[in-house]
Structures are given as structure tokens and as C-alpha cells.
Amino acid sequence: MERLDKAALNALQPPEFRNENSLAATLKTLLFFTALMITVPIGLYFTTKAYIFEGALGMSNRDSYFYAAIVAVVAVHVVLALFVYVAWNEGSRQWREGKQD
């Protein structure tokens, strides 16, 4: 009889109260990739412009702007691809855990 009561109580609980940890983990993941989206392209832009294209390769100021911008755009796409990969795996993991309940 007690098992039936516990099963009924678990069925009546709203789903948002069962997955508070997954919401916090999702928010942490989102904030982490937001920080990456801001810092990585900007950092790579100025680093590659100053040290690689102008410093090591001896390019002009105008050419180094162009190539550093390409590096920054590629970095944005890499961060986005990593975010999609992590979000996809996190969602499928939560789906599997929910399916086992």
C-alpha cells in the first residue's frame, strides 16, 4: 500500500521540481560558452594580428586586419560547434535519465 502511495505522489510532482540540478547545469554551460564566445574570438583577433601576422609574417597593418578577422570568425564557429555538441549530449543524457525513471 505504501508503494502505491509513493508512486502516486511521484506521478503528481511537476517535472520542473524533479530536475533543478539539470537547470543549474544547463545555466552553467550556457554562461561558460557565453564567456568563451566573447573572449576567444576577441583574444585571438588581437593576438594573431599583433604577434603572428604583423610580427612573425611581417604583413602590413591592413592585411593583418583582414586575416585576423578571418581567424576570429573561425573561432566563433568553433565555439558554436562545441556548444551544440555539449548541448546535444547533455540533452540526450537527461532524456535517457528521465526515461529510466
Swiss-Prot record:
Pfam families assigned: VMA21
Organism: Mus musculus
UniProt entry keywords in alphabetical sequence: Cytoplasmic vesicle, Endoplasmic reticulum, Membrane, Transmembrane, Transmembrane helix
Key word Membrane present: yes
Recorded GO CC terms: endoplasmic reticulum membrane; endoplasmic reticulum-Golgi intermediate compartment membrane; ER to Golgi transport vesicle membrane; lysosome
Assembly and oligomerization: Associates with the V0 complex of the vacuolar ATPase (V-ATPase). Interacts with ATP6AP2.
Lumenal side: 47-65
Name this polypeptide is given: Vacuolar ATPase assembly integral membrane protein Vma21
Membrane-spanning ranges: 26-46, 66-86
Coiled coil ranges: none
Side Cytoplasmic, residues: 1-25, 87-101
Subcellular location: Endoplasmic reticulum membrane; Endoplasmic reticulum-Golgi intermediate compartment membrane; Cytoplasmic vesicle, COPII-coated vesicle membrane
Encoding gene per record: Vma21
HAMAP family per record: VMA21
Family to which this protein belongs: Belongs to the VMA21 family.
Membrane topology: Multi-pass membrane protein
Keyword Transmembrane helix: yes
Main location: endoplasmic reticulum
InterPro entries: Vma21 (IPR019013)
Protein origin, superkingdom: Eukaryota
